[in-house]
Amino acid sequence: MRPSHESAVAAFEQVGTAFIHIAVSTPNLFRFLYLEGYYGSPSDNLDALITNEDNAALIKRISKELSISEENASRYLQNTIIYTHGIATLAATGVINASEKEMMQSVNRAADAFLVQEGVPVKKIPCWEETQK
């Protein structure tokens, strides 16, 4: 899925929402695509999560939008991908049975915390108040 939102952070959230939706609505497809190696061979390091062309462009947009370095934006993206993949994997394998809404709220809270960790002031985080409920 290619994100369509103007805001880089919101576009990234669109991808996370779609990822979790696949895990919940079609767990066998999720397992086939993301857990059984369909999308390529295992990587030697975590940097592989953020080095594809789409993510590199998103990192540049997030960096510019939030006035943080590309390195900080990269760490934010990487941490959020790992967290989202973990939640989606727990859902697809039946370990948790939360609603998509609950899972996205959890992902959004973690993503906001990752932004703060990378030096983004709370007032610059889109929808901070909503995700902290």
Residue ranges and their predicted role:
Residues 2-9, 41, 96-100:
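Short, surface-exposed loop/turn segments at secondary-structure junctions
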Residues 1-28, 70, 80:
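Hydrophobic alpha-helical connector segments
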Residues 20-24, 59-63, 85-92, 115:
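Short amphipathic alpha-helical interface segments enriched in basic and hydrophobic/aromatic residues
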Residues 42-67, 74-78, 105-119:
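Amphipathic alpha-helical packing segments from all-alpha helical-bundle domains
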Residues 71-93, 105-113, 127, 131-133:
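Hydrophobic alpha-helical segments that form the core
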Residues 6-8, 47, 126:
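A generic structural signal for short
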Residues 24-42, 89-97:
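Amphipathic alpha-helical segments used for helix-helix packing
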